[in-house]
């Protein structure tokens, strides 16, 4: 779909060529452009070798694009999927010149020997860790795979990075790590725990950046809704009251780079995601962008919450809200550190690994033992499919929702 850049042209006859522009996910978020301290970002990227895991993905590729603006000595694009990574490398060479120092490396974070080989060969100074299994319902069906990749892949990467003298490690986290109801979010919470553990016990500066949904990324709602509209509908949403925090891909990547420059090791940085967006409103607006009218000539169908899904996400725990601290950037806050019993944590990790390697449903119980705030919204059926355990028919208490959202917004304002 294309938008008319100047609505006044509607009354002046046929718009001229160039009067239209492509739909941008930012059209759905009414807020100012992110302001960056580029000197701070340059200070740790310029002239350095930078490794981006998951570099061919939506966020990883945008990180690579923006890192190139700061003239790194070398950019390493690490991904298990060769096609997207190769296309990104070609894009960067077309933009910056065929002789730029960009290397595409194929491998898995689950393969520690491959990681050691990469670190020994290229000696990166900075690591951005964007590789992960992120699809919430799919990870409910394959919880052991989520654990192997997200938890132990991250542990492999942290271990190899620390052993090979990496200066700075930036982990991409998610609001789904807060009071998780799904396996993916729970694994990301454990990754935050790993970050703080390595920050405390190694010389490497480690930090995580927690943010919400990214508009336009693989599997996000706008591409899904667009495809459904092009196919004649229906447009499907899981619950009429479901809300989410959103950022555009460039916004998220810019703030990740900025948070990486703050360099307070062990920090969990929380991004100000602005006001939450009701998914029903998003679907309605997009349907109208395409010239249809919701539930007149384009049906909106409510399908019920998917396994692991919840009605609204939170950017911080209740225990974090009163202790959030501000940073030099007005859109980045710091969550208070977790108290982690190192011996108990590593014992729980061993138990989790055992369950994951046996593809045991017991992995979900192990996750619950490790993350006390994890309350799974899943039930395994007799045919081995997984369904949401609750929430499909309930109506959200709008007063409670608004109270929760107001408290989060107030906390961010107070921190400023």
Residue ranges, per PLM feature:
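Flexible, Lys/Arg-rich cytosolic regulatory linkers and terminal tails that connect or flank
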Residues: 1-49, 162
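Conserved Rossmann-fold NAD(P)-dependent oxidoreductase catalytic core, especially the SDR/UDP-sugar
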Residues: 12-13, 123, 129, 133-192, ...
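Strand-loop microenvironment adjacent to phosphate/nucleotide-handling motifs in alpha/beta enzyme folds
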Residues: 35, 40-42, 193, 197-214, ...
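N-terminal Rossmann NAD(P)H-binding glycine-rich loop of SDR-like oxidoreductase domains
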Residues: 50-70
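Short beta-strand element of Class I
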Residues: 73-76
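Helix N-cap at the beta1-alpha1 junction of Rossmann-like dinucleotide-binding domains, i.e.
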Residues: 79-84
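Hydrophobic/aromatic anchor residues within beta-strands of the central parallel beta-sheet
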Residues: 104, 146, 206-209
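Conserved Rossmann-fold cofactor-binding substructure of NAD(P)-dependent oxidoreductases
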Residues: 105-126
């Amino acid at each position: 779909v294309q938008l008319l850049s100047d609505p006044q042209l509607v009354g002046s006859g046929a718009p001229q060529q160039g009067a239209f522009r492509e739909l941008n996910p930012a059209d759905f978020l009414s807020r100012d452009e992110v302001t960056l301290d580029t000197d701070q970002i340059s200070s740790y990227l310029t002239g350095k070798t930078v490794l981006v895991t998951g570099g061919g993905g939506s966020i990883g590729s945008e990180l690579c694009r923006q890192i190139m603006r700061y003239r790194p000595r070398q950019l390493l694009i690490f991904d298990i999927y060769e096609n997207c990574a190769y296309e990104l490398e070609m894009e960067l060479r077309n933009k910056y010149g065929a002789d730029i120092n960009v290397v595409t490396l194929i491998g898995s974070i689950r393969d520690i020997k491959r990681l050691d080989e990469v670190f020994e060969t290229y000696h990166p100074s900075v690591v951005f860790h964007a590789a992960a299994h992120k699809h919430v319902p799919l990870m409910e069906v394959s919880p052991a795979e989520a654990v192997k990749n997200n938890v132990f892949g991250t542990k492999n990467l942290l271990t190899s990075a620390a052993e090979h003298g990496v200066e700075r490690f930036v982990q991409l986290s998610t609001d789904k790590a807060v009071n998780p109801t799904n396996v993916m979010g729970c694994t990301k919470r454990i990754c935050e725990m790993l970050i703080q553990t390595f920050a405390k016990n190694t010389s490497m500066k480690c930090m995580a950046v927690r943010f919400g949904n990214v508009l336009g990324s693989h599997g996000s709602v706008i591409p899904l809704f667009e495809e459904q509209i092009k196919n004649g509908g229906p447009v499907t949403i899981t619950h009429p009251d479901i809300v989410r925090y959103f950022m555009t891909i460039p916004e998220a990547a810019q703030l990740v780079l900025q948070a990486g420059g703050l360099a307070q090791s062990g920090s969990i940085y929380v991004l100000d995601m602005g006001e939450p967006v009701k998914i029903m409103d998003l679907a309605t607006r997009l349907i109208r962008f395409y010239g249809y009218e919701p539930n007149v000539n384009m049906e909106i169908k409510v399908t019920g919450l998917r396994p692991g899904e919840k009605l609204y996400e939170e950017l911080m725990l209740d225990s974090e809200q009163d202790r959030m601290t501000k940073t030099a950037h007005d859109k980045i806050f710091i969550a208070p550190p977790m108290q982690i019993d190192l011996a108990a944590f590593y014992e729980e990790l061993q138990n989790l690994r055992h369950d994951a390697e046996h593809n045991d449903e017991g992995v979900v119980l192990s996750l619950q033992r490790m993350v006390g705030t994890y309350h799974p919204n899943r039930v395994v059926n007799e045919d081995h499919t997984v369904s949401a355990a609750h929430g499909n028919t309930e109506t959200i208490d709008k007063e409670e929702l608004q109270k929760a959202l107001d408290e989060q917004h107030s906390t961010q304002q107070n921190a400023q």
